C-alpha cells in the first residue's frame, strides 16, 4: 500500500492601490513589474477604478454607495493584504490614494481595510524618494484601521536609478512584497 502525501498550498492575494492616475505612471509600471515578479503563492491584484471614485462624502455613503466605491470595497475585502504603490505629490500622498483609503475606512470600524495588513512602497522623481508620501499613507491607513506592516518600507528616488530595471531596487521591492505576504499579526496571550 502506498502512501500519498498531499501538500496544501495557499495563495496570498494582495490588493494593489496605485496612487497615480497618469497613463504612463512610473508607479503603475512598478506595480505591474511587482505583479509579474510576485513570489510563488502570492497574487498581486492591481485595483483599477480609483479615478471613478467620487470624493468621499458621508452623504453619498448613506444607503446605496456609488458603484465604484462598492467595487473597491469588494476587491479589497476579498484580498488578504493591501499594498499601496504611490508617488509623492507636493510633499504628500496623492489625493486619489487618500480618497481610496477614506472609502475603504467606512463603515466606521468595519471598513474593508480594518485589521488588514497594509504596506506602502513607491518611487518618485524627487530627491527624497517619496518619504513624505510614504509617511502620510502609513499614518492614514493606520488611522483607518489597517495593520501597517512597518517592515514594508521602500521609498525610492527615480532620479538615482531606473527603478524598473535596477536589480538592487527591485530586490528591495520584491522583498517588501514577500514581507507583506508573509506577515502574521502578533497574537496576544489570553
Model-derived features with residue positions:
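A general structural signal for well-ordered alpha-helical segments in protein cores
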Residues: 14, 27, 31, 53, ...
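N-terminal beta-loop-helix "entrance" segment that forms/cooperates
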Residues: 49-66, 160-163
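N-terminal beta1-alpha1 ligand-phosphate binding loop
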Residues: 9-42
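Glycine-rich phosphate/pyrophosphate-binding loop and the adjoining helix
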Residues: 2-6, 10, 147-190
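Short, glycine/serine-rich, charged loops/turns that create anion-binding
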Residues: 21-22, 51, 60, 108, ...
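Short beta-strand elements in bilobed, periplasmic/extracellular small-molecule ligand-binding domains
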Residues: 41-51, 55, 147-156
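Helix-loop-strand module that forms the ligand-binding subsite of alpha/beta enzymes
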Residues: 64-144
